[in-house]
Structure formats: structure tokens, C-alpha cells
Amino acid sequence: MQDQVTVIPINAGFYSTDAGASLGVLPRAIWEKTISVDDKHRLRMRINLLLIKDEERLILIDTGIGNKLNDKKKKIYNYTDFLLPNSLQEVGFSCLDITDVILTHLHFDHAGGIVSEFDGVMQLTFPNATHWVQKAEWEIAKTPDMLNAAAYNYQVDLALLEEKGKLKLVDGEHQISEHVEVMKVGGHTEGFQIVKLNFPDCKAVFAGDIIPTEPHLYLPVISAYEISRKDTFKAKLMIKELNIPIFFSHDTEVWST
């Protein structure tokens, strides 16, 4: 890659989720041969973000869970501390340096870090950043229906983001910077977007929860969390046909193909 373009995987922490729900219709008799779970049959998931330095822009994909979970939810999800600020510091940046945040969707493990609690005050984690969200995703997160109500519980955070004027809604494909583009695919959520990286000497895609881990590369392996398994399957097929490296959102062993 050219000097002005840099891509850095960022670890925002770890949490655990039900293995059966994550791996969908893949039979346990198959996956348990190679995939480890804890005593509650939970998979350990890393919260993988991507930091992209594209000339004068410093773009972060997703924000992780954040630091606002109560003790009960921390126990349920076996959540570590919010590692994102420290992970950014380890590569020479701070939250204030981020110019853009791309949110693949607004579930808690990807959008929980939009707002952080600092000294008892709720404030934007990335106050200088424009936050890019698909219009369909924003609308369902702001006023979720009965099917989606349990998945979206950050209305206060979203209101603060809107109030501070740091929100940009897009509809479909949109060019974020010279080398970074978002594309709405749906599937996992109604307004889910993937991020395509089009660099001069290579291309890649951040598939997010469409392909969260290496086992999800197999087309039939689709989690039970999808709002539309059919759309997720179509998105997976399209991504694989691109024949470019795929960054995973939750694999604990590898960052990409």
C-alpha cells in the first residue's frame, strides 16, 4: 500500500455469545470438533474493529460495546473492559484523532461505544468524528418494532449523536473517502452495511457480522440473529465472489482471510 494509506486491526475487547445461535443450522456434532465453548456453551468473541488512515482522514469501523454495561450484563456476556481507547493509544492515536466512524449496524456490540461515560458524564467517544449510518438502520434503531426491540437499546446514545450534529445518514452505496466505500446489504439487520476498501495496490472488505468469524465463510453457516437469512446468504455470496481479503468482526484467532 502507498504510504498515505494504512489499515490497522483494533481490538475493542472480548465477550461471549451462545454457540448454537452464532453458528445457526450448523449441527453441534460438526462444530464442536474444532470450536471450543465455555461451561455455558458460549463462544468467546473478539470485538474486531478496523482503523483506516486514508491521507488526512482517520476512519474507524464500528465502536465496540463501550463502557456502560451494568454488572448484570457484563456477567451475561462475559465482557472484558472497554479496550478501544487503549488499543488506539498503542498504535499512536487517541479518540480525538478519529475523523470518521462507520457503523456497520447499531447492535450493542458494534454501536455501544458511540457514547462513553467519563467521570459520570455521558459524552461522544469520538467527538470530532462524523458517524456514518445507513438510513434504514437508523430508523429501525430509533423506533424499533416488536421484532427488533430487544436488539436496539441505545436511543439515548443515538439522540446525543444527533444532537451534536455528528451524524450522516446514507442510503445504499456511498463513498466515504477516496479509498473507502460503504454498501448496504441488509441481512443481519435491515440497514446493515459492509465496508469496501479500494486501495491502489489491493482491495479488501470488512464484512462485519455477515461473516463474523472464519467458520462463517461457509455459505450455509448463518447465525440465528439474522433479520433475513436469505439476504445474508446473498450478501455472503456477493462478498465471496469479490475474491478479495475479508476482515472478520469477531474471530479470536485471525483478523482476515
List where the protein language model places each region.
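Short, P/G- and charge-enriched loop/turn segments at secondary-structure junctions
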Residues: 35-40, 119-120, 182
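Metal-dependent catalytic neighborhoods of phosphoester/phosphodiester hydrolases
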Residues: 74, 112-121, 257
